[in-house]
Amino acid sequence: DLLMQGKNVAVITFTNAATDEIFNRLDYTSVFHISTIHSFVWDIIRHHQADIKKLYCFYIEEDIKVLEKKLDETKNKTTKTYFANVEKLKYQKERLTKAQTIEKFVYNPNGSNPEYNALKHAEVIKISAQMINESDMLQRIIAQRYPILLIDESQDTKKELVDAFFEIQKNYADIFTLGLLGDQKQRIYTDGKENIGSIIPNKWEKPRKKMNYRCAKRIVKLANAIGKDIELHAEQDPREDANEGTVRLFVIQQYDGINKD
């Protein structure tokens, strides 16, 4: 029915490898539209060039204001940090001048995007999140085109983008269903939505994966012990035929010369 109406179930994830894996597991069923997060949101906003340009320039202008304030408030104007900020300010002003001449922004989800009119990966997420969050038209387009949207690794998805998708769910609950797939214990990036489980409405279904098919018994036991402080009632059980496994703790002497960045 969805295909006959020109609609799809959208599944968005982080990497091309994950996209290929999901395609394979779903046996390339055409009702599913599977893509990376960057590809998905770029496809939504790419025709709205004027809005992209407006936000692109706005973010640069905000960076310029911050840098100018830093420079004005710097008392010691002979430090490396001061001169680095001077160069950053010069660079941002040059970017703004070039940006005002751009007629069309481009973006390649699989490339480095070196062109002066090409958006960087982080810029696509930032711009699209704000555009979707503020535009009823874009929300309606997503809801009508993808009545079911599943976010893989939702615990690491940029929080502004998660907020935008929640806005669609709130405004178009009668035709749009949002699904979050992920594990708070596996959260890697700090710019993801913190404690995402706490913002999920009570009326949502909350299926849990109780069986851990992959790990040895001791690994599951350790993960449960660590995870209880992160997410309540998220314990898993190992397969009955799983290996007992081994957990080792390594203690090393700290070396101050290590680059922790």
Question: What feature does the model see in each segment?
Answer:
Residues 164-243:
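Conserved RecA-like helicase ATPase core segment
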Residues 21, 43, 141, 160, ...:
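Phosphate- and divalent-cation-binding pockets in alpha/beta enzyme and binding domains
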Residues 3-7, 141-144, 173-175:
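Short helix-terminating capping/connector loops at secondary-structure junctions
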Residues 72-150, 159-164, 190:
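Accessory N-terminal region flanking or inserted into the helicase ATPase core
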Residues 4-18, 32-34, 181, 209-211, ...:
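Conserved RecA-like ASCE P-loop NTPase motor core of nucleic-acid helicases/translocases
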Residues 1-52:
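P-loop NTPase Walker
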Residues 46-55, 221-226:
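Short, surface-exposed amphipathic charged segments that create phosphate/polyanion-binding patches used
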Residues 52-65, 228-234:
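A polyampholytic, Gly/Pro-enriched intrinsically disordered region
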